[in-house]
Amino acid sequence: MSEPAQKKQKVANNSLEQLKASGTVVVADTGDFGSIAKFQPQDSTTNPSLILAAAKQPTYAKLIDVAVEYGKKHGKTTEEQVENAVDRLLVEFGKEILKIVPGRVSTEVDARLSFDTQATIEKARHIIKLFEQEGVSKERVLIKIASTWEGIQAAKELEEKDGIHCNLTLLFSFVQAVACAEAQVTLISPFVGRILDWYKSSTGKDYKGEADPGVISVKKIYNYYKKYGYKTIVMGASFRSTDEIKNLAGVDYLTISPALLDKLMNSTEPFPRVLDPVSAKKEAGDKISYISDESKFRFDLNEDAMATEKLSEGIRKFSADIVTLFDLIEKKVTA
């Protein structure tokens, strides 16, 4: 075999290609769109923290200039101008990402609206309108919303009435996942690594492979969705290692950071399919319901200390980063 042929065979057999071959759709988790083309992901996800990190890079100064210019023209007060500029910045990043990925981009609603159903709906509609004004169809955008009671209800209405596709994020519990499926949202992002972080911190133990609590959580959700025929896509998110990814091969989607995508691309470790719809149907438990019972949803979520703490922490972190992003844009709007 010639050297180029050997090299080609090696690339074809890398762990990333095997993961894709397992049936899992690979998504790039970053705002740094310059780093994703080589991985050939189907979709890309962003969040306030990732956009903030990317916005600080000189490479993306042009996008900020466009957003600031837009903000200045669309707002009477500085506050309005800054908010409009930030919304436009999210759309600018989304537009650039969609030049690279063939599928969809996830763009997040301001995390400070996580407990306000109506404000979340209005912000989602506004973001979609901005995308459409830039020639991007709503079919190519997923609106990311925190999986609070209010967020899930907002997503339900957006999906039903507006045909706006939603990605329910900061999902740490089976309770949240069940309610999202009943709301018929397009996609959920159950977090894996952050669940592992909590258990390691609270027990002092290490968890590997199938014993990883984050992996167990996603498997349970996947099995339940497949058993009861829910069409909501399960997209595992927030990974600490390629080991977590390996143990979820076969799940609908996985959104992975460029650093871990790079590791997968440069590894030839076998990635056999672990999850599949047929065995999932045998493993899931009884059907339950939350979508019309707010008190039951809140109580059962509250019973899960990990999910309650991680949801609160996640909203605080994303809110802090959106405030920092607003401050960064305000300096430019008022300069």
From Swiss-Prot:
<dbReference type="GO" id="GO:0005634">
    <property type="term" value="C:nucleus"/>
</dbReference>
<dbReference type="InterPro" id="IPR018225">
    <property type="entry name" value="Transaldolase_AS"/>
</dbReference>
<keyword id="KW-0570">Pentose shunt</keyword>
<dbReference type="GO" id="GO:0006098">
    <property type="term" value="P:pentose-phosphate shunt"/>
</dbReference>
<keyword id="KW-0704">Schiff base</keyword>
<dbReference type="GO" id="GO:0005737">
    <property type="term" value="C:cytoplasm"/>
</dbReference>
<dbReference type="InterPro" id="IPR001585">
    <property type="entry name" value="TAL/FSA"/>
</dbReference>
<comment type="function">
    <text>Transaldolase is important for the balance of metabolites in the pentose-phosphate pathway.</text>
</comment>
<dbReference type="GO" id="GO:0005975">
    <property type="term" value="P:carbohydrate metabolic process"/>
</dbReference>
<dbReference type="Pfam" id="PF00923">
    <property type="entry name" value="TAL_FSA"/>
</dbReference>
<dbReference type="InterPro" id="IPR013785">
    <property type="entry name" value="Aldolase_TIM"/>
</dbReference>
<keyword id="KW-0808">Transferase</keyword>
<feature type="active site" description="Schiff-base intermediate with substrate">
    <location>
        <position position="144"/>
    </location>
</feature>
<feature type="modified residue" description="N-acetylserine">
    <location>
        <position position="2"/>
    </location>
</feature>
<dbReference type="InterPro" id="IPR004730">
    <property type="entry name" value="Transaldolase_1"/>
</dbReference>
<dbReference type="GO" id="GO:0009052">
    <property type="term" value="P:pentose-phosphate shunt, non-oxidative branch"/>
</dbReference>
<comment type="similarity">
    <text>Belongs to the transaldolase family. Type 1 subfamily.</text>
</comment>
<keyword id="KW-0007">Acetylation</keyword>
<comment type="pathway">
    <text>Carbohydrate degradation; pentose phosphate pathway; D-glyceraldehyde 3-phosphate and beta-D-fructose 6-phosphate from D-ribose 5-phosphate and D-xylulose 5-phosphate (non-oxidative stage): step 2/3.</text>
</comment>
<protein>
    <recommendedName>
        <fullName>Transaldolase</fullName>
        <ecNumber>2.2.1.2</ecNumber>
    </recommendedName>
</protein>
<dbReference type="GO" id="GO:0004801">
    <property type="term" value="F:transaldolase activity"/>
</dbReference>
<comment type="subunit">
    <text>Homodimer.</text>
</comment>
